[in-house]
Amino acid sequence: MIMALLTNDLFLSCLVSGISAQVIKYGVQTVKTRKLKLTPVHLLKKIFLETGGMPSSHSSTVTALSTSIALTEGIGTNFIIALAFALITIRDSFGVRYMSGVQAEYLNALSEKLKKEIKIDTTKIKVVKGHKKKEVLTGIIIGIFSAYIVCYL
């Protein structure tokens, strides 16, 4: 079963695209914050669990899936299904994630108020207000390139 996955162009396109986007995201954040931390636990956490930022790994992964289906099977039913889910995922990276970021801000404000009024110890929620267009576009480009590299090399 593992060998079947490791020889499947669709799976490999998604894997290469997702990991590439996350590694690039780590590089971008390192340059922005000027903090380089190379411990294995930190790297694994950043590469596999970090959300938000440049580029969008969700956009890159769903684009890689759609593109690799188009390249291996043509523009048929499977491609249309993958494309529909890709468009939903990409759309939600703007809208739904924006609203969850707004809600996180309200919850953080409420948390601070409760902390002051009744001395409850709380933890701030990470606020990510969706992706910017350039983050999603960069993710899409990474997805297309990843699919081409996996399917044609």
Q: What spans do the regions from the language model cover?
A:
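N-terminal signal-anchor transmembrane alpha helix
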Residues: L6-Q29
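Interfacial loop-to-helix junctions that mark the boundaries of transmembrane helices
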Residues: I2-N8, E73-G74
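Membrane-embedded helical hairpins/re-entrant loop segments and their flanking transmembrane helices
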Residues: Q29-L49
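Membrane-embedded catalytic cores of phosphoryl/pyrophosphoryl-handling enzymes
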Residues: I19, V23, H42-L153
